[in-house]
Amino acid sequence: MLAVEIQMNTDDIGVLSPTSTCHTFDESADGYGRGEGVGAIFLKRLSDAIRDKDPIRGVIRGTAVNANGKMTGITQPSAKAQENVTRTAYQFAGLDPNDTSYFETHGTGTQAGDPTEVRAIGNVFIEDSQREELLVGSVCVPIS
């Protein structure tokens, strides 16, 4: 955050909002506002948490990644790549996307990123289902 070079580089490629506010999934989306936040996740083997009688808030059942550093980059997101990695994570976890009622997004607040992400989410969670709605959110808005 404090390095002026990073601020200048992100401004040069057009991802920073001139209003310094992230308008995720909004027609006025014009980039993101830089901000700082901390999220902490404490991981423990499920068997250990049960043994220790810890409150269990969630269980990680599967993960997936598809960024290799060789693709087009952050200014040209791929809906197909996002769709594929989401489907892979669900397959690894043994979960059915139709059982999902809420999806937390990246939510960049950019004209390229938001529609691409929504398209991928729709392809995974809406296209082949009978669902009427899927709640979608992004932590980017309150942080930036």
List the predicted regions and their residue ranges.
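Condensing-enzyme catalytic core of the thiolase-fold
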Residues: 1-144
